[in-house]
Amino acid sequence: MLFLMGVLALLLTTPNANADDKEKYKLFAEETRKEVWALKLPEFTNTAIPDKYKDESAVILAAHSRLEITKKTRFNVGAFLGGFHYIDREVNCRDLYRMLVQINDKAALKEFSEFDYKAEIRKKDWRYDENYQQVLGVRIIKPDGTVNEISTDEYMTATEGKKDQEQLQKLAVPGLEIGDKVDIFFFNYTSLENHNLDPFVFRFRQSHPMLSYTVHCEIDDKLTTQYRTLNGAPDFKQSKDENGNILLDVAVKDIEQTEPDLWYNPMQQTPMTLMYITNSKMKKY
């Protein structure tokens, strides 16, 4: 079953025609956070840190990337009457990155105390339609095991871009202290019509040691998927589900080497996988 199908259904329906965009986004964000926190990820229950990392500024206890992409087609009456190609091809993408981080000093506290991101972007013209929404979720896990989810009241919303069409969310994480663990995720929902997705990058090295990194992809087999492993990145285990969707999985443990701040070229040195997913039957004009 595809991840977050309930969230997708929420996006494709309008419970109240008079609800404004901010309320719709707030509901979407709340439902997304519920879905993500409910995911069964065993690696995120591991809180033991090896002695060799005890002096690190921060340790990524677990990280997880999840990518789910579906495709559907529909008849476009307006394009048909106008003499254009009349089959619209829509691609829906759900892209998640989540990590659990141990905060050990002031530098790490500063690094993980503030976040900003673009909540919504909409681009549309006669050739294509693009809708993008992003959700940030943050939880603080205290040394005694207490879990504090950051309330949506702590998020500040600003607008930018042409005619203030792009919403920018900002968050200063309250209550985070040295010795805490912070559970963070970024969830991106992208809907494209007659257009291709940007490439995806899975990085197997970060600025802090990483005890576990897992990647799971579910991709509609009607799309063209190509990927390339670079700099020693591990290859995916490939399979298919009962619906014929392409499944790609990889898991890596104890990534000790980190990316330095100076004299380092990630594209040439960081193990990573570049993935291109294209609508091979995208209409042409």
Task: For the regions a language model picked out, list residue spans one by one.
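Beta-strand-rich, non-transmembrane domain signature
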Residues: 19-284
